[in-house]
């Protein structure tokens, strides 16, 4: 069973949001690389919820859960959605990560995703 130690580096200061500076993985038998997930929806929050439901489904299919996540990479189409994304995480991440140890996350703003209606995509790395 993998041990994932989520931690911040004091010399780097506090992270800007709900993420940690690094995840140290030891004892992993397997590493999961989950493709960027997209979800339909009429608004940004609906897409975020759908994306993370799909990630949870993928994790469960491999016998994993939120505690197995070592890193997220998030792609947003519009920079004005950053506050919405942060608000969504503030509301939902405590349910997903009740210990308050949030995996590292890289947030990128891109020109577009694979199809126009999609506003958010999240890629995940997990360890078992």
Residue ranges with predicted function:
Residues 1-71, 76-128:
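N-terminal presequence-like segments and the immediate start of the first folded domain
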């Amino acid at each position: 069973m993998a041990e994932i130690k989520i931690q911040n580096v004091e010399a780097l200061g506090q992270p800007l949001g709900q993420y940690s500076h690094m995840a140290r993985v030891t004892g992993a038998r397997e590493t999961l690389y989950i493709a960027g997930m997209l979800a339909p929806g009429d608004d940004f929050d609906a897409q975020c919820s759908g994306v993370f439901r799909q990630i949870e489904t993928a994790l469960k299919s491999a016998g994993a859960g939120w505690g197995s996540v070592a890193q997220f990479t998030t792609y947003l189409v519009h920079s004005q959605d950053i506050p919405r994304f942060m608000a969504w995480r503030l509301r939902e991440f405590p349910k997903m990560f009740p210990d308050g140890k949030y995996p590292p996350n890289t947030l990128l703003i891109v020109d577009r995703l694979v199809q126009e209606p999609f506003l958010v995509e999240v890629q995940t790395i997990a360890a078992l």
